[in-house]
Regions:
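Positively charged n-region of N-terminal signal peptides that target proteins for export
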Residues: 1-4
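Bacterial N-terminal signal peptides
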Residues: 8-15
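Activation corresponds to long, low-complexity, non-globular regions
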Residues: 81-101, 107-116, 261, 267-346
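Secretory/extracellular carbohydrate-interaction modules
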Residues: 83-183, 334-345
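Short, aromatic/His-centered strand-loop micro-motif at the edge of beta-sheets
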Residues: 186-208
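Carbohydrate-binding surfaces in secreted/extracellular proteins
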Residues: 203-243
Length: 346
């Protein structure tokens, strides 16, 4: 199983150098992740070419400040402008086994006020599978959708919601695959492959929220297969209220939750100067299936290549701690299409 996890991440393939590697062309060097220390007391973490700051990285100064951007031959060229969507950090984790699911829940702690201007998607259920159908969901600072879906297409004007809960699944465009909550909206589209989604207003900010996937007793026939609706609910601990994001249909009447799961924190919609991002902290913890705590024997943090490492994540005893908006100088392992750091492996 451990080998399967590593193979899934796809991070070791391509990292093995041939026995007799050719000398690198100095005119077109390949950037490698690393760190540098300079006589003025500053340090650097990021891409390095020919022993110099060259590529995307962060320079740290003795007074505690830093600058993140593009470098060439030890010179700072420009601030890094992140093009959306940007998964600032992902957390690939494995449950100890598959589960027959009635409920799947977790607690999200937002430890700072998050500004409306930051289009942030927090997805504690960043990728899960029920009976082989992928789903994802969480909360967003800016969200919206449409009143209805007709023949697989969105109908009517776009309705902005502001802060909201969002729940999506892949593999269909059918209107019967979704049920809006009261006051909610929906979407059916193909820009991320075929998917349907339900959304509803949730005035969230600093606080604690329990997010739960709930298997309902409602079923529907889709493509000659009986499906069961699953509702996403959010309990606001401060308001002591439960809010519904809506429901999506999944094939079968007995729902099996896959071992493999994922969390992501994504900036979407707007380009941002990373040096001007707010510093934010979050905790994802207390993952439970059918009300019972689950073991999490494997965790790896994932970072997109071609972006700076501008988030940090740790894991200990069922608790994921995430920081955004601050450069992460911890060493990462370079993989194929992504960089990663092992956080837990049993």
């Amino acid at each position: 199983m451990k080998k399967q996890w590593i193979l899934w991440i796809g991070l070791l393939i391509g990292m093995i150098s041939p026995l007799h590697a050719q000398e690198e062309n100095p005119m077109e060097p390949t950037p490698k992740l690393g760190t540098l220390t300079f006589e003025d007391g500053s340090t650097y973490s990021g891409e390095i070419e020919l022993g110099q700051m060259s590529g995307i990285g962060t320079q740290y100064f003795p007074d505690g400040t830093w600058r993140t951007g593009h470098f060439q031959d030890n010179k700072y060229l420009a601030d890094f402008i992140a093009k959306p969507p940007w998964h600032m950090v992902g957390l690939d984790f494995m449950l100890d086994r598959e589960y027959i699911m009635e409920t799947f829940s977790m607690d999200l702690k937002v430890l700072n006020d998050v500004p409306d201007s930051l289009q942030l998607y927090i997805a504690p259920f960043g990728t899960s599978e029920l009976n082989g159908t992928q789903l994802y969901g969480g909360i967003q600072t800016q969200c919206g959708g449409y009143y209805s879906v007709i023949k697989g297409e969105n109908s009517g004007r776009f309705i902005p919601l502001g802060r909201a809960v969002i729940f999506s699944r892949w593999g269909t465009r059918a209107s019967l695959a979704l049920k809006k909550a009261e006051g909610g909206v929906c979407e059916s589209s193909g820009y991320e492959d075929d998917f349907v989604s339900v959304r509803n207003t949730l005035k969230w900010n600093k606080g604690t929220y329990t997010i739960t996937l709930v298997k309902t007793k409602e079923t529907v026939m889709l493509d000659s297969v009986l499906h069961t609706y699953v509702e996403m609910q959010v309990y606001d601990h401060k308001k002591k209220q439960t809010f519904s994001g809506g429901s999506l249909a999944f094939p079968g009447t007995t729902l099996t939750l896959n071992q493999r799961n994922y969390i992501f924190f994504e900036l979407y919609g707007k380009r941002v100067n990373v040096n001007k991002l707010p510093h934010l902290k979050f905790v994802c913890e207390n993952y439970r299936v059918n009300g019972n705590p689950v073991e999490i024997p494997f965790v790896a943090s994932i970072y997109e290549k071609n972006y700076p490492s501008y988030a940090d994540a740790t894991y200990n005893e069922g608790k994921f701690k995430i920081e955004l908006g601050k450069p992460n100088g911890k060493p990462l392992t370079e993989g194929d299409g992504m960089n990663y750091r092992m956080l837990n492996e049993k």
